[in-house]
From Swiss-Prot:
Pfam family name, one: Ribosomal_S9
NCBIfam families noted in UniProt: PRK00132.1
Stretches with biased composition (Basic residues): 114-128
HAMAP family linked to this entry: Ribosomal_uS9_B
GO cellular component: a single term: cytosolic small ribosomal subunit
Entry-linked SUPFAM superfamilies: Ribosomal protein S5 domain 2-like (SSF54211)
Annotated region (Disordered), positions in chain: 97-128
Protein name listed in UniProt: Small ribosomal subunit protein uS9
GO molecular function: RNA binding; structural constituent of ribosome
Entry keywords, A to Z: Ribonucleoprotein, Ribosomal protein
Superkingdom of origin: Bacteria
Gene3D superfamilies hit by this protein: 3.30.230.10
Origin species: Bacteroides fragilis (strain ATCC 25285 / DSM 2151 / CCUG 4856 / JCM 11019 / LMG 10263 / NCTC 9343 / Onslow / VPI 2553 / EN-2)
Family in the record: Belongs to the universal ribosomal protein uS9 family.
């Protein structure tokens, strides 16, 4: 099997994934998964598509992650891994879609408007 690549985005985070056959090692920006994401919850989020299909020990994953925060990066990585797994085997797509791993979350930060301190907040109104 050749190297399969995919892209995942969430908020400002971008994850570029390169999947090849191996032993289940996930390397993010030349660091181990547990070193990059110390939180077990974020590690679980990243591994969700692999665990759903039962292929966690079958592929080595190299990741280039940039932008955003920890949560956004982990969810961008989850989407990228799911897309790469579908490129490898298209029959897995319905199983991943039913769990919501194939859907790009469109929510992002709303822009600040002029004449207001924040996106929705207005300056205090004084009647007199």
């Amino acid at each position: 099997m050749e190297v399969v690549n995919a892209l995942g985005r969430r908020k400002r985070a971008i994850a570029r994934v390169f999947v090849s056959e191996g032993t289940g090692k996930i390397t993010i920006n030349k660091r181990d998964l547990a070193e990059y994401f110390p939180s077990t919850i974020l590690q679980y989020v990243v591994k969700q598509p692999l665990n759903k299909l039962g292929v966690a020990e079958k592929y080595d994953i190299k990741v280039n992650l940039c932008g955003g925060g920890f949560t956004g990066q982990s969810q961008a990585l989850r989407l990228a891994i799911a897309r790469a797994l579908v490129k490898i085997n298209a029959e897995d797509k319905p199983a991943l879609r039913s769990e919501g791993f194939m859907t790009r979350d469109p929510r992002s930060v709303e822009r600040k408007k002029p004449g207001q301190p924040k996106a929705r907040r207005r300056f205090q109104f004084s009647k007199r």
